[in-house]
Amino acid sequence: MTAAQTAGGYVPLNERPHGGHAKLLGLVGAGKRVLDIGCSSGYLARPLVQRGCTVVGIEQDLVAAEQAREVCAEVLVGDAEEMELPFEPASFDVLLCGDLVEHLRDPERFLARIQPLLRPDGRLVLTTPNVANWANRLGLLVGRWRYTDRGILDRTHLHLFTRATLVETLERAGYSVVELDYTVPVPGVGTAGVEAAAHAVGRLRPSLFAYQFVVSAAPA
């Protein structure tokens, strides 16, 4: 099951301005050649194509891959960590890893392996949950650490990151962090004003309040 897949289908694009999807799309930009790793049904590829990007996807779920082929220039089917990637060095402007690295068996090794695919001015753009979020810290204080079907402690997450360990992992894999943003969702409240206020509070201490990190990194 990919990061964007649920038992009932595939997670739709969240276009809220302070949400992870909108921030990812903003970091990718327009008119880029993008490798979308773990592309799911193409929910991120679709708006990128509408912005003039050429998107190549990798997806191991057959049903999702078929949906992604409707919008991607090409979709490779398989486990990205295991497959031979048939691309020349410096083939892409952007390597897109939306909610991917926490699912990988060896994130650092994989990120290092794909780094040569970036053009010199290219970017790795990714999101991943913040395991040091205040709710998890509070749970530890009261002796509670429960895995769930979704969220930061999703049962399918193999690696969890704090802000510091994420930066360290990227640097060891051959990247330099250019921008590190975050999301602070407000469950059950969808107004732009409330979300903007939550984001402003998160700015006071992102390592505590961030639910998810949104990163742009350049080849070092």
Tell where the protein language model's regions lie, with residue ranges.
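Short N-terminal helix/helix-N-cap motif within the alpha/beta-hydrolase-1
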Residues: 105-109, 136
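Acceptor-substrate binding/catalytic loop of class I
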Residues: 148-165
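Conserved N-terminal segment of class I S-adenosyl-L-methionine
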Residues: 1-90, 94-96, 108-111, 126-128, ...
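Short catalytic micro-motifs in class I SAM-dependent methyltransferases
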Residues: 98-100
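A short glycine-rich, Lys/Arg-flanked "PGG" loop and its adjoining helix->strand segment in the class I
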Residues: 109-123
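Short glycine/proline- and charge-enriched loop/turn segments
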Residues: 142-152, 193-199
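Substrate-binding/catalytic lobe of Class I Rossmann-like enzymes that use SAM or dcSAM, i.e.
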Residues: 167-176
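Conserved class I S-adenosyl-L-methionine
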Residues: 126-148
